[in-house]
């Protein structure tokens, strides 16, 4: 792999997350509540909850906070009902953007997302307009500076657990899985005490779009910043080659 430093992107995202950790924890708390209501409080029998817990751990959410969130969701029948919704559209120069939200008011969320695209001279598209440009994969990033294990041994653990691919970059290792095999692979790495800088099911662009015009870069950053500031937005995926 070349041209896209996964760990550099993760570090950049972590820096932004650390500046708004309260928001990140609130977002994950909502996801925990929805996952528990849909599938129960036992992550061994609730794949969605297991995924959210993995996301929480990769964002350094304390275990007691995770456990409190699960217990609260399991015992609270009067909490706010949140719904997942997804918006897809285009940024400058045909960049593709997918926005995943968790909201208690779809009308509010739709208006806010549309406003973000409009202010960055982008547009919301039809429901399936950019999906074909991404692959849904489990992605685990392991920083070399945090991992003492030999690359070959690490690769064997991942592949034996069901990983589809193992890639090495200058600063990190990337493990890719199918969404269904993600938790098994993540658990296998965790059992070996392998530190993971990122572990989640994500949307990976098949190709990246380079933006050279300053106006395009300003506009896509405006879209992404407005979406990042929206409490209803859970995750944003794009194919801009930052």
Where are these regions (language model features)?
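Positively charged, low-complexity, intrinsically disordered RNA-binding extensions
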Residues: 139-242
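N-terminal cationic and glycine-rich segments that engage phosphates or anionic surfaces
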Residues: 1-125, 129-141, 238-241
